[in-house]
Amino acid sequence: MLDQLSVESIPPLLGASKAQLTHWAQTYQQPAYRGQQVHQWIYQKGVHSLSDITVLPKQWRTEIADIPVGRSQIHHRSAAQDGTVKYLLKLADGQIIETVGIPTQKRLTVCVSSQVGCPMGCDFCATGKGEYQRNLACHEIVDQVLTVQEDFQQRVGNVVFMGMGEPLLNLEQVLAAVRSLNQDVGIGQRSLTVSTVGIPKQILKLAQHQLQITLAVSLHASNQRIRTQLVPSAKHYPLEKLLKDCRAYVTQTGRRVTFEYIVLSGVNDQTEHALELAHHLRGFQSHVNLIPYNPISEVDYQRPTQKQLQQFLNSLQSQHITASIRRSRGLDKDAACGQLRATQMIDPASS
């Protein structure tokens, strides 16, 4: 992958493993440890240009200066009152993606995008209201984590693939990013969460990799009728089949599945819905995350009250379903769940 080729044909180095970078350095007749130095400077020191790696011989630095590391630019940064920071990152082709840094007392979490836009068109989600452009490459995903880590000057402890896009439609690059975040950046697999609305066959394909990551399935409904209304792709992936595949995932990996459930007042928040959901999940190694709807301008869904949320939670727990309410972060900067969208999908300066 990283043999000595013309600059135009060499992919960005970000996302490459220590072994790959060692081999790459050797193609330039450099000793193996030079590749290890490049690895350290890319992943630990956050270098944006190979010419800035001062421990390398000056002549070689000049020779490789034009080979891209694969880092993006911060196009815009906005901080919410709760400390959450939303970033618009400008990619090499001018496309804009969103990334969110979410600090808590215990850890720094990064919510990464896996696509530019999203083709799934979920009714309550801002990203789905915009145009889908393309999949992100591995380096464009890993870069988001390093960018937040550098900006906060704090080590990232948790990464969730819950930003723009459907990760399982970009499974190859997402898996490559998971490997790099784990082995190169040093984030444990159990601190990585991949979210999906459910893509036929892809959950089973993911299970074959036997990863220790968390799979989060965006369920959002207790029956097929409501789910089809909220998630158009559910027409091609019935709820029963989705849940069957999730059970198979648990069996194959030994990891419980997290079910994300955006609560919409008057739509999917009634006691009957909670009991229906509990029926589906009884005996299932799972956890339900209840997420209060975060408003977007295109639709008139209503956010539930705290009382409604608590009643729904109580109904689930009365049926012995493990569940919790997720606190919304970054709401005042449109950085909360379901609110992500790049206000400029392409930077005007690049066109």
UniProtKB/Swiss-Prot annotation:
The active site is at E98 (proton acceptor), C337 (s-methylcysteine intermediate). It catalyses: adenosine(2503) in 23S rRNA + 2 reduced [2Fe-2S]-[ferredoxin] + 2 S-adenosyl-L-methionine = 2-methyladenosine(2503) in 23S rRNA + 5'-deoxyadenosine + L-methionine + 2 oxidized [2Fe-2S]-[ferredoxin] + S-adenosyl-L-homocysteine; adenosine(37) in tRNA + 2 reduced [2Fe-2S]-[ferredoxin] + 2 S-adenosyl-L-methionine = 2-methyladenosine(37) in tRNA + 5'-deoxyadenosine + L-methionine + 2 oxidized [2Fe-2S]-[ferredoxin] + S-adenosyl-L-homocysteine. Keywords: 4Fe-4S, Cytoplasm, Disulfide bond, Iron, Iron-sulfur, Metal-binding, Methyltransferase, rRNA processing, S-adenosyl-L-methionine, Transferase, tRNA processing. GO terms for molecular function: 4 iron, 4 sulfur cluster binding; metal ion binding; rRNA (adenine(2503)-C2-)-methyltransferase activity; rRNA binding; tRNA (adenine(37)-C2)-methyltransferase activity; tRNA binding. Disulfide bonds join C111-C337. InterPro entries: Aldolase_TIM, Methyltransferase_A, RlmN_N, RNA_MTrfase_RlmN, rRNA_lsu_MTrfase_RlmN/Cfr, rSAM. Binds 1 [4Fe-4S] cluster. The cluster is coordinated with 3 cysteines and an exchangeable S-adenosyl-L-methionine. Belongs to the radical SAM superfamily. RlmN family. Specifically methylates position 2 of adenine 2503 in 23S rRNA and position 2 of adenine 37 in tRNAs. This is Probable dual-specificity RNA methyltransferase RlmN. It comes from Acaryochloris marina (strain MBIC 11017). The lineage of its organism: Bacteria, Bacillati, Cyanobacteriota, Cyanophyceae, Acaryochloridales. The gene is rlmN.
